Structures are given as structure tokens and as C-alpha cells.
């Protein structure tokens, strides 16, 4: 069944239960069920907002109801359930905004991936200088590509920037000419 963001989350849960009740010969052997929240509300209203909390509570009820229904199935003990998220969130504070333009000339980079982490692709002659400057920037930690700690599970992928910059929790890091987007 194709993804449809307009289908309520509870209806999606009901669909999964219905599929699990199909005869074995037609029952799906892999079911993936996606809920795009609380990502959207967390980005719009901040992770600490009452709107985000309300959404998390709503999703928790749906998952609770789903597992209560699933436990009633004869095949429950044969099912492996994996519940995961694509990332976490933290509220950032305007006083912790770090504009990389205050430290580095943007034209010294071939490409910049703004995000958490920030991945920088400096021009070959600028890597060492950029690294040295970033080591002195408050509320951020920088690693060279070959020094990224294993806990981040980035390996040695060629798409990873030469510099991996991670802001402290509560810090917003960007390479933008304008002020903090709060």
C-alpha cells in the first residue's frame, strides 16, 4: 500500500493489524509503517513545546493500542517488531547561535551541508586553516574526516565532508549571512 500522509495514524495501525490477520500464504512478511510525526511539529513548534508533547502522547496511545491488538493475534510470538526514529531533536537558544560566517569565509568551501552535524568541504588549500579556526569556535566540536569517532557510525564514506562539525546540544550552527532564524 503506498504511503499517504493524509491517512490518520490510527487507520495506519488498523491496516497493519488487518495485514497480520491475513492467511499465511498472502500475509506480508515485512511491513513498514511510517509516522511522520513528531518530526514536523518538533521543527515547527520546537521539541519542548506543548504541541510536540501532545503529539508524542497521541502517538504513544496509538502505539499502545496497536500493541494491545497485536498481542491478541495467534501469531504475536512469531512477529519481530522494530520501533525507531530517524533522528532526535533538541531546543536551541538564540544566545547559542553560531554563524560560521563570523569565523570562516564561505567562498573557501566547495560545498557546505548545514545541519547536525555540519559537513564542510573546504577547498584543498584551506582544510588545515579551517580546522584550526573551528577548534577555537565556542560550543562546537570539529573533527577531520579520518578522526570522526566511531560512535557516530560515519565510517569512511566518500560523501562525508573533510570537516565534521558538531554543535553542543542547545546550539544552532549555520553558514548563513543573516542572523539567527529564531
Regions found by a protein language model. Name each.
Residues 111-182:
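Active-site neighborhoods of enzymes that stabilize oxyanions during catalysis
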Residues 43-46, 93-96, 176-178:
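Short, solvent-exposed loop/turn and secondary-structure capping segments
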Residues 78, 85-125:
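Acidic/histidine-rich catalytic neighborhood
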Residues 1-25, 145-146:
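Active-site-proximal alpha/beta segments of enzymes that process anionic O-linked groups
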Residues 20-24, 35, 67-74, 124, ...:
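Sec/Tat-exported extracytoplasmic proteins
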Residues 30-34, 82:
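Structural motif
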Residues 9-21, 38-79:
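A long, amphipathic alpha-helix that forms part
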Amino acid at each position: 500500500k503506498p504511503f499517504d500522509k493524509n491517512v490518520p495514524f490510527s487507520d495506519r495501525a488498523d491496516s497493519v493489524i488487518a495485514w497480520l490477520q491475513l492467511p499465511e500464504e498472502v500475509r506480508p512478511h515485512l511491513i513498514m509503517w511510517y509516522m511522520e510525526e513528531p518530526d514536523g511539529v518538533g521543527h515547527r513548534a520546537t521539541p519542548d513545546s506543548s504541541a510536540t508533547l501532545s503529539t508524542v502522547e497521541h502517538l504513544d496511545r496509538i502505539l499502545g493500542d496497536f500493541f494491545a491488538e497485536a498481542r491478541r493475534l495467534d501469531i504475536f510470538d512469531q512477529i519481530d517488531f522494530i520501533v525507531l526514529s530517524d533522528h532526535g531533536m533538541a531546543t536551541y537558544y538564540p544566545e547559542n547561535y553560531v554563524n560560521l560566517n563570523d569565523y570562516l569565509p564561505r567562498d573557501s568551501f566547495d560545498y557546505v551541508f548545514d545541519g547536525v552535524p555540519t559537513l564542510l568541504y573546504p577547498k584543498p588549500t584551506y582544510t588545515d586553516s579551517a580546522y584550526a579556526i573551528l577548534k577555537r569556535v565556542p560550543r562546537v566540536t570539529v573533527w577531520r574526516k579520518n578522526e570522526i569517532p566511531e560512535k557516530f557510525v560515519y565510517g569512511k564514506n566518500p560523501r562525508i565532508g573533510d570537516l565534521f562539525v558538531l554543535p553542543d546540544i542547545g546550539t544552532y550552527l549555520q553558514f548563513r549571512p543573516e542572523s539567527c532564524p529564531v
